[in-house]
Amino acid sequence: MLTRIALLLATNIAVVLVLSIILNLLGVEQFLREQGIDAEMVTLLIFAAGIGFAGSFISLAMSKYMAMKMMGAKPIESPRGEQEQWLVETVRRFAQREGIGMPDVAIYDAPEINAFATGARRNSALVAVSSGLLQNMTRDEAEAVIAHEVAHVSNGDMVTLTLIQGVVNTFVIFLSHVAGRFVDRVVFKNEGGHGPGFWITMIFAQMVLGVLASMITMYFSRKREFRADSGAAKLAGRDKMIAALEKLKRSVEPQNMPDEMEAFGINGRMGGSSIKRLFMSHPPLDERIEALKGRPV
């Protein structure tokens, strides 16, 4: 858990620093002031939104490529064998029922039962399953998992969470810069440029706000997970989806799913304390099963 938070903060700080330098070198802030937009907070908010959304959309645009590289996923271009043929045809069948373009289909080598979907557009997505899923699940259970991933694509969850991340990034950047400027000018009486007080306060505020932002993003991720379960129940059948989740309860906890894909997988890291649950991308499996049991067949 601490590693995930540290990676989030490090990435957020790196994006802010790099994009801030680039935009300042391009003279964007000076241009805005010359156009009469000299209200400091307005300029700062524009910068925050640009930086906040840029990082999210760059990650989204690269998501398929990065997912394939990080997971070592091998795309199925020409199915080899009955199992790969079944996998491709199952994805195609669900995609057609949802009215979306055929996603790329891939398999990655991992012992745990898991799968993920990613991609910038509904009609150009990627659905990947682990070798452990194909080896340890029945066809009915695997079908439900595939339906879950196709539902993520059909619901546009990748773009939705990217927009949410962009919004929270904007406020993290904006509020941390406001705090830094306040301390720099009011406490250290520095009216020219950004002194040490600004940088120390800004980075500290960004770390604190980044943790809160992660909690917000994970809250929405958990909500989208319930919706994907419901979509899978519609596509594959409620009982199949419940059976798949029951199988996941008895499976090995996923360890090597990168955070970028975990939110769109079928199985996330198990929670412990109430605090840890706030950072979970997936609801507890028991809650997901109970939600499906309350859904009409």
Swiss-Prot record:
Membrane topology: Multi-pass membrane protein
First-level EC class: hydrolase
InterPro entries: HtpX_protease, Pept_M48_protease_HtpX, Peptidase_M48
Free-text comment on the cofactor: Binds 1 zinc ion per subunit.
GO-annotated cellular components: plasma membrane
Active site (record annotation): 149
Cofactors named for this entry: Zn(2+)
Entry-linked PROSITE patterns: ZINC_PROTEASE
Pfam entry (one): Peptidase_M48
Residue intervals passing through the bilayer: 5-25, 41-61, 158-178, 196-216
Keywords: Cell inner membrane, Cell membrane, Hydrolase, Membrane, Metal-binding, Metalloprotease, Protease, Transmembrane, Transmembrane helix, Zinc
Positions that bind Zn(2+): 148, 152, 225
Known EC number: 3.4.24.-
One GO MF term attached to the UniProt entry: zinc ion binding
Signal peptide: none
Classification via PANTHER family: PROTEASE HTPX
Family membership noted in the UniProt record: Belongs to the peptidase M48B family.
Protein name in UniProt: Protease HtpX
Organism: Halorhodospira halophila (strain DSM 244 / SL1) (Ectothiorhodospira halophila (strain DSM 244 / SL1))
